Amino acid sequence: MKRLSSSEQSLELFDRDSPQEYSCILPNELTVSASALRALEDSLIEKLPSGLTLGIRESVLCETLSNKVPESVIVHLALGDVRGEYISLYSANVKRRLKRAALTPAVVKDYYTDSYQRYVCKRRRIPCVDLPGTREPARSTVALLFYPAIQRNPLTQKPFRLQKDNKMFVKCWAEIWDALNFIQKYVYYMRPDEITTPSLDTSARLELLFGYVKTLYMWAMWLMDLLDTRIVSNKFGTRVPISIDNIFSNLTEVMGSLSSDKWMSTALLCRSIEHLLSSLIHISSLWTCCQWRETKHGEMLRPIVSIVALVSLLHHHCQYIINITFNGYARWLEGGLGNPMLRSAIRQQKRFEHYLGGLFPSIRPTAWGELEFSIRAWFELALAKSMVIHGSLLKKSIVSNNVLEPLCKPRHTQIGERHDTRFTRSTSMPSSSGHIHSTLQNNQQAIVPECSSGQLSSIATALWSADELQNDYVEMKGGVLCPAPQPADSITPNSSQTNNGTASDGSPTRVTDASLDPTEVESSTTVAETPPVTVAVESVYVCRETARNKSPSSKVERILRRLRVATD
């Protein structure tokens, strides 16, 4: 047989009797989506703690249905994060601000005493004489907002006369600081992987945390009442209408009355909260029964610094839980931003800011999200994965009667309705072509996102008409806000407004966006209502079943296998 040369073989390909058709070879959607997802993952993976990328977490979540996260996995990740990786970016940004402000312990003590003196003078409506070098609002705000949360040791270790009382105080402070840190780890690592699927156990944990936040704010105001009583001889009156026993008993009754399914998913969280409450009870007995240390001139500088630092620490912790909710966790909350437990916690925070906002500054969710960038990075990556798996159009839905239906309908924004950024409490995720709409009606379940396929790194900004939670703010540098003075009745719910977005006088309610500049007003457009999407339930869980059976070695391969099954 004659052997053909290479050139003759190449010509043989075109000399066949039947014509050969050639297609245009281009990367398909699967390859492009995987490449984009891999590039996004490589750019964001360094900003996330190692606990969120552990193989044991991924394998357990793949074996768990209904988008649940077992509490044993959460505690395992929280205890394993010894170096505080979950808050490393946030701590680095805060420490950089503290270093830029040149805040030493002695300087912080001066700011605390001076801030409390100005707070007392303002309440008594008398002129205040500032100490030399302490009238710097920017440095004072940073010291009051961040310093106790970064430094584990108390500023003053001897606020009492007796040595045994001081030792007990230092011990209680360390226990409180460690307990708050562990609960923050728990909150950070309790998120599920699927951001488009409801998570009932995550919602139950969030509701328990909101009740816990409400209790901490009430106890903080009780402690400030105790300090004011000792300093100015009770000229102001109490700000907490119930006793300290009832403050803690209300939360313990809530934890004791949890249903069996909620108790199964929050048992270890309840134990951690009870441990913190016991430390707060011990330190309450110290401030109530023990003798406070005074200077030669009768001034109680050390007790003032200790109590202000403790209340600042608790306020920072409560803001962490609330701000992380507005930066994405509200996606899994039953009822969304209209959840009654969330609104109760926000109302208590507003009450705290109304009475003590001049002493303890607050940070809005948008500024907090810039400091804690790992939350935004994780949600960008999770949204990209969901868009690759489920397609370009995302609908947050619940399972009802064997179909998937939207949790609630988007709210219509009336043409000409003005946006006022003073009244705002919304998520600080990047905005997209759609918005996460929320409602205040009781019968609606959660928020509905609409995302564009061309924006993988976009989670819509929430538009929340929080009329009964409105509060005037005076903006300070760095995203830190202090509430303006308001009458006492402004913290009560506004009953003159109805659920249809209008007040009793017919005027439209205000819809705001925290990502806007306060000096700008966004032009309003009509948001079209999206019809419900009906999909078979089996198609939602086919990807999870595939991941359970295949057990791919990498996250990208797992996503590709899910996508192949979904497209077949």
Swiss-Prot record:
Name the record gives this protein: Tegument protein UL46 homolog
Its membrane topology: Peripheral membrane protein
Subcellular location(s) of the protein: Virion tegument; Host cell membrane
GO CC annotation, single: membrane
GO biological process, one term: regulation of DNA-templated transcription
Domain of life: Viruses
Main location: virion
Family: Belongs to the herpesviridae HHV-1 VP11/12 protein family.
Ranges annotated as biased composition (Polar residues): 489-512
The species this protein was found in: Gallid herpesvirus 2 (strain Chicken/Md5/ATCC VR-987) (GaHV-2)
Entry keywords, A to Z: Activator, Host cell membrane, Host membrane, Membrane, Transcription, Transcription regulation, Virion, Virion tegument
Biased composition regions of type Low complexity, renumbered to the chain: 521-530
Region called Disordered, residue ranges: 484-530
Matching InterPro entries: Herpes_UL46
Function (record text): Abundant tegument protein. Trans-activates the immediate early genes.
